[in-house]
Amino acid sequence: MAKTLNSICFTTLLLVLLFISAEIPTAEANCDTYLGEVTVYYPCRERDCEAQCYEHYPHSCKGECEHHDHVVHHDNEEEHCHCYGR
């Protein structure tokens, strides 16, 4: 009886651990939808970028300072703040 109970508890614990570990990477990986671009002062800082993203796009989950391909878009070296959401 005790071995059966221990086996059931171990199996249940293993399943719970599996469900939790499978959910964590998917929650972090879903922040990849481009929402738009916001203006920040040069030089672009991640903290300022994330604050501006949250202000303009309340459902944003991250903001990143990124370089554009300046041959096509601009003549000067410039970083832009891109906002991403789920």
Swiss-Prot record:
Belongs to the DEFL family. GO terms for biological process: defense response to fungus; killing of cells of another organism. Keywords: Antimicrobial, Disulfide bond, Fungicide, Plant defense, Secreted, Signal. It is found in: Secreted. Residues 1-29 form the signal peptide. This is Defensin-like protein 205. GO terms for cellular component: extracellular region; secretory vesicle. Disulfide bonds join C44-C65, C49-C81, C53-C83.
